[in-house]
Amino acid sequence: MQGRLSAWLVKHGLIHRSLGFDYQGIETLQIKSEDWHSIAVILYVYGYNYLRSQCAYDVAPGGLLASVYHLTRIEYGVDQPEEVCIKVFVSRRNPRIPSVFWVWKSVDFQERESYDMLGISYDNHPRLKRILMPESWIGWPLRKDYVAPNFYEIQDAH
């Protein structure tokens, strides 16, 4: 079943794949990495002016990585704002996605966390560096194929 936004994107010749609806009835779309920045700008102009959240996950060991964006169209006088979920899948060998920082500034720390934990590089992000782990940390801790390094914690140090 095609949702309202998917129908609008088809009407305007914008390539995407409908993934259906989640349990709350929110339309979910898959966008190719190379198309994401231009479609993000179009969605902003269309009225999706609020980025509720961005997260990322490892789909399967050795498989794809996904960056997920939850967008909301907030308008005055509307009790139930329109929401959409966008998923961008990338290869773990070269996980690069255009940053949407210049569209929604609120994605700043969220893209940095996705970079820090999964190694997804967000092109044109102004401050893409580790945010939770030390800069010297090797690897991407939330990848399913990540092997934790051997280290010993000093217990009861006073």
Curated annotation (Swiss-Prot):
InterPro entries: NADH_DH_suC, NADH_quin_OxRdtase_su_C/D-like, NADH_UbQ_OxRdtase_30kDa_su, NADH_UbQ_OxRdtase_CS. Keywords: Chloroplast, Membrane, NAD, NADP, Plastid, Plastoquinone, Quinone, Thylakoid, Translocase, Transport. It comes from the Eukaryota. It is a peripheral membrane protein. Gene3D superfamilies: NADH:ubiquinone oxidoreductase, 30kDa subunit. The keyword Thylakoid applies. It catalyses: a plastoquinone + NADH + (n+1) H(+)(in) = a plastoquinol + NAD(+) + n H(+)(out); a plastoquinone + NADPH + (n+1) H(+)(in) = a plastoquinol + NADP(+) + n H(+)(out). Its EC number is 7.1.1.-. GO terms for molecular function: NADH dehydrogenase (ubiquinone) activity; quinone binding. It is found in: Plastid, Chloroplast thylakoid membrane. GO terms for biological process: photosynthesis, light reaction. NDH is composed of at least 16 different subunits, 5 of which are encoded in the nucleus. NDH shuttles electrons from NAD(P)H:plastoquinone, via FMN and iron-sulfur (Fe-S) centers, to quinones in the photosynthetic chain and possibly in a chloroplast respiratory chain. The immediate electron acceptor for the enzyme in this species is believed to be plastoquinone. Couples the redox reaction to proton translocation, and thus conserves the redox energy in a proton gradient. PANTHER family: NADH DEHYDROGENASE [UBIQUINONE] IRON-SULFUR PROTEIN 3, MITOCHONDRIAL, NADH DEHYDROGENASE UBIQUINONE IRON-SULFUR PROTEIN 3. HAMAP family: NDH1_NuoC. This is NAD(P)H-quinone oxidoreductase subunit J, chloroplastic. The gene is ndhJ.
